[in-house]
Design a protein with these regions (language model features):
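Active-site pocket-shaping loop/turn-to-helix segments
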Residues: 17-43, 63-66, 89-106, 115, ...
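Active-site-proximal alpha-helical scaffold in enzymes
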Residues: 92-123, 170, 176-205, 262-270, ...
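Flexible glycine-/small-residue-enriched beta->alpha junction loops
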Residues: 116-174
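Conserved catalytic cysteine-centered active-site region
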Residues: 29, 61-117, 149-152, 163-167, ...
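Short glycine/threonine-rich loop-to-helix capping motif typified by GTGT followed
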Residues: 65-71, 218-219, 224, 292-299, ...
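Conserved active-site "lid/cap" helical segment
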Residues: 2-80, 171-183, 200, 290, ...
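N-terminal extracellular/periplasmic Venus flytrap/periplasmic-binding protein-like
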Residues: 16-17, 27-28, 32-37, 48, ...
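Beta-strand segments within the central parallel beta-sheet cores of soluble alpha/beta enzyme folds
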Residues: 51-60, 87-92, 117-121, 187-192, ...
Length: 343
């Protein structure tokens, strides 16, 4: 989608909760309440904007099997106390669900279908339920299989090729093999990520965007490891391969998390109604598919397509933010962009 030639779309504000770890501070907080919290925060921080002017609320939600209640965006609208006339819709593009929400809201604004929208994402991996498939007949004999909806495949179609249904961690191992990414390189990259996050917190760079959840004693991200050392990371054993060939560990993988984030998006008219200066303008977006066993390399082609739509090149970008599901996955993507400064 290239939207620059249609209507300009502005990011007016951005908020998020602190990110809680699996079973951590947000263990007792429902995902619809997390989503409502960031929606309400955006409204409260923009007092000049009449909430009735919000044309849509779009949220990404990759799990959505439990308290998300089918359409967590609409639940957030109602729980946040917005007018009942404000609609809400939930989208799912797995790890990219929150970004997909931003794309869809921006597209609506660019095409004139909306002037003001809220777009975000929410997950509670802690509270994602266990599920059991309904039997095909009454009173079946034997036992029923149960799946966790926190992460990974469930109720896999037997027609799906086995190499496509591997775990995310095994996919990271395949990427490490493909590019010869060592365990040491992954650990160094992960350690640097934690250092950057800790330094950003210390410098107050997150203070304006983070909105703590009332009643929960959490004001900073729970999973940032301050003071980690190469020696500590080296002691951890590989999680997904135990045959001596594994390189992916808990330390160089993303943790399981709970949290929510949201953006306030507008066109020119909506921007004027907020009385605010924009943080950014959305120029272009793109999505792409890839062999499922190499899912983490999807950003490479998507970034190239988005840059082409925007008429830009990597050299035009001042800051480049890349999803880091696994250090191996991020390093695999960076193989395509050797000119980037990894700092």
């Amino acid at each position: 989608m290239s939207i620059r030639t249609v209507r300009d779309v502005y990011v007016v504000d951005a908020v998020r909760t602190p990110i809680g770890k699996f079973g951590g501070a947000f263990a007792k907080v429902r995902p619809d309440d997390l989503a409502a919290h960031v929606v309400r925060a955006l409204v409260d921080r923009t007092p000049d904007l009449d909430p009735a002017r919000i044309d849509d609320v779009v949220f990404g939600d990759a799990n959505g099997a439990g308290e998300d209640n089918r359409d967590v965006a609409r639940m957030a609208v109602l729980l946040a106390g917005l007018p009942v006339t404000v609609p809400g819709v939930t989208v799912n593009r797995l790890c990219g669900s929150g970004l997909e929400a931003v794309i869809q809201a921006a597209r609506a604004i660019a095409l004139g279908d909306a002037s003001v929208a809220i777009a975000g994402g929410v997950e509670s991996m802690t509270r994602a339920p266990w599920v059991v498939q309904k039997p095909e007949r009454a009173f079946p004999a034997g036992h029923q299989e149960m799946w966790s909806t926190t992460l990974g495949w469930r109720m896999t179609n037997p027609r799906m090729p086995a190499e496509w249904t591997i775990s995310l961690g095994e996919s990271a191992e395949l990427i490490a093999e493909k590019y010869g990414i060592s365990r040491e390189a992954q650990d160094r990259f992960a350690l640097e990520s934690h250092r950057k996050a800790a330094d950003a917190w210390a410098a107050g760079l997150y203070d304006k965007e983070v909105v703590p959840y009332q009643g929960v004693d959490l004001v900073r991200d729970e999973c940032v490891r301050e003071g980690s050392t190469p020696e500590a990371l080296a002691r951890l054993k590989p999680v997904f391969r135990t045959d001596g060939t594994g390189t992916v560990t808990a330390a160089n993988s993303t943790p399981l998390n709970d949290g929510a984030a949201a953006l306030l998006l507008t066109d020119e008219e909506g921007l004027a109604a907020t009385g605010r200066e924009p943080l950014a303008r959305i120029s272009a977006s793109a999505v792409t598919g890839i062999e499922p066993q190499f899912f983490g390399l999807g950003p490479v082609e998507a970034v190239q397509n988005a840059l082409a739509k925007a008429g830009r090149s990597l050299g035009d970008l001042g800051v480049f933010e890349l999803n880091e599901a696994f250090a191996a996955q991020a390093l695999g993507c960076l193989e395509a962009w050797p000119e980037l400064d990894r700092a």
